[in-house]
A protein has these predicted regions:
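Chalcogenol-based redox active-site neighborhoods
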Residues: 1-160
């Protein structure tokens, strides 16, 4: 998926080490990603993880997908009493990557390798071409809602 997982917390490095060690001692699992100690909250504030007008540094349980240009593409906000859903995070990441590489959108409840939604035509000539394509391939409901199989469908199967 060509993606890096990074933890970020305003806790100290010593606190992170104690947490990682505790996880390892109790479960035998080594956390396989780095955790950044953002003691002054600079990174957390930049991405809106901590409000700039609030002095508290209470932890938030959010997942941010940030692209290689530093743009936040997706934020999943979890209440403190709800665990994260890793399959949904991976599905959302795959959806972003597939949509970007196909210049398309993924519909509600999309799962990898299902058809994606083509962007609507921008001219009347494109509309006529799209309508004919739908009639020929039966790949849409109307000129503004048509689908295609993602170009890199094999990749999303390999990444599972």
């Amino acid at each position: 998926m060509n993606t890096c997982l990074i933890g970020l917390s305003v806790d100290s490095n010593a606190s992170h080490l104690a947490w990682l060690y505790d996880i390892y001692c109790k479960t035998g699992i080594r956390v396989p990603f780095p955790i950044i100690a953002d003691r002054n909250g600079e990174i957390a504030r930049k991405y809106g993880m901590i409000s700039s007008d609030v002095s508290t540094t209470e932890t938030v349980r959010n997942v941010f997908i940030i692209d290689d240009k530093g743009i936040v593409r997706l934020i999943l906000v979890y209440p403190m009493n709800v665990g994260r859903c890793i399959p949904e995070i991976l599905r959302a990441l795959t959806a972003l990557q597939i949509a970007d590489s196909n210049e398309a959108s993924t519909p509600a409840n999309w799962v990898p390798c299902q058809p994606v939604i083509l962007p609507p035509p921008q001219t009347f000539a494109e509309l006529e071409l799209r309508r004919k394509e739908i009639e020929k391939r039966q790949n849409g409901m109307t000129w503004y809602l048509s689908f295609k199989t993602p170009n890199n469908c094999e990749k999303c199967i390999e990444d599972k």
